[in-house]
Design a protein with these regions (language model features):
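Extended mixed-charge, aromatic/glycine-enriched low-complexity segments
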Residues: 1-398
């Protein structure tokens, strides 16, 4: 929770940096409370430690048990701290979505796990020495004038590429160009990424501002999720696309190249709200990385005309001011690479699809709707997607 009398439950107190006033958020209450469940956990660990001499046969075994117990305590405390940070960082995503309108777009970026080339029929020897095909996913979210949220996905496929800031900036430029063509009224952009080095570096942070100015849009924010902070929009969309490709493979086709992968994604009418680009990124001759000491500790950035305002935890304190004058913007712009669209596609139409809220039905509601009957009709069973189970066997698309 944002405010609590328990010290490590209060986000303002736990995530503030007492050594830096820029990252310090004041609380209006005293932290003199205690959590009964947290105390129970600590008490249980103490009881385990007290019982170790009773179960250890030798001193070496006792030392090993003590070490394992101490490691378990540290892991539990680290996990608890991670949950607090993850909730706080997710607040940035929620607030950005609430601010969206029909002139702004929220972009979530991530590299999907490489796809291994596969044949419809392949021998065991064909399985070895494969090189995965890299692909990048960008999910764009906007809010229509009637307050309905819409999303679309940009997929960039590569034969081979380095997953570095140079490639990411090329993808950013391509996405902004396509969005500006399809949405002439676009004026604001928000970014959210994970903590991969290709995103969480000075070159990407500063280069994104240069690209936005070049595209004629205003870059408002860039936020980073907490490491291992659950699945995001890109992971969910990647799972849908992989399932679609599996159907194409089961139909007797091969997926061994980036071009065949594009054909698989676009087969059978394609995946709703997904546009695919067969891409190539030219190698730069010079790679002068932008230097910014301590950038890996910054998780939230707000772009202003004269400066950057940065935080190490979302909304904790007024933030630290970083002037644009410390970066050499002309040099950065000269070194930016552009994505080469191998099929030279520039669609004016952006396939945005409406986002439908998920509704969860409790067990009690389900039981009451059945009217106490043990046997429902076949039509009732088929009408609920929550009662469908997919076959776990690879290659099977049956549901039960």
């Amino acid at each position: 929770m944002e405010s609590s009398v328990v010290p490590d439950h209060c986000r303002r107190f736990a995530l503030s940096d007492s050594k830096c006033s820029d990252y310090l958020e004041a609380c209006n209450h005293i932290h003199d409370g205690a959590c009964d469940r947290c105390c129970l956990t600590e008490r249980s660990i103490h009881e385990i430690e007290d019982s170790l001499p009773l179960v250890a046969a030798t001193s070496e075994e006792l030392d090993g048990l003590k070490f394992n117990t101490e490691q378990a305590r540290r892991n539990i405390n680290a996990w608890k701290a991670h949950l607090l940070r993850a909730v706080n960082q997710d607040e940035a995503r929620i607030n950005v979505i609430e601010r969206l309108d029909d002139n702004s777009v929220f972009l979530v970026q991530d590299w999907a796990m490489k796809v291994l080339p596969r044949k419809y029929r392949e021998s065991q020897s064909d399985w070895f020495e494969k090189r995965g095909l890299p692909w990048h996913i960008t999910v764009a979210v906007r809010r229509r004038s009637d307050q309905q949220l819409e999303s679309m996905t940009f997929v960039h496929l590569f034969k081979t590429c380095s997953q570095d800031s140079n490639t990411v900036l090329g993808i950013m430029a391509d996405v902004l160009t396509k969005l500006k063509i399809g949405m002439p009224n676009l004026d604001s952009v928000f970014y959210r990424q994970d903590n991969a080095g290709c995103y969480h570096c000075a070159s990407t942070i500063v280069g994104a501002k240069v690209l936005a100015d070049k595209a004629g849009v205003s870059l408002k924010r860039m936020d980073f999720s907490d490491p291992q902070g659950k699945k995001g929009a890109c992971d969910r969309k990647a799972a849908t696309i992989k399932s679609h490709m599996q159907i194409f493979l089961n139909a007797g086709n091969d997926i061994e190249t980036a071009a065949q992968m594009k054909t698989a994604i676009e087969s059978s009418g394609g995946v709703p709200g997904v546009t695919v680009t067969l891409s190539e990124i030219p190698e730069r001759q010079t790679k002068n990385a932008v230097s910014w000491e301590g950038v890996s500790f910054l998780n939230n950035l707000e772009y202003e005309s004269e400066c950057l305002r940065v935080w190490d935890a979302y909304n904790m304190g007024p933030g630290k001011i970083v002037s644009w004058s410390r970066f050499d913007a002309p040099t950065i712009e000269e070194e930016l690479s552009s994505i080469v669209d191998l099929e030279n596609e520039r669609n004016m139409h952006l396939p945005f699809v409406a986002l439908k809220p998920r509704t969860l039905t409790s067990v009690s509601e389900t039981a009451s709707s059945d009217g106490g009957s043990d046997h429902g009709s076949a039509s009732d069973f088929g009408s609920s997607s929550s009662e469908l189970f997919s076959c776990p066997e690879e290659g099977c698309v049956m549901t039960y």
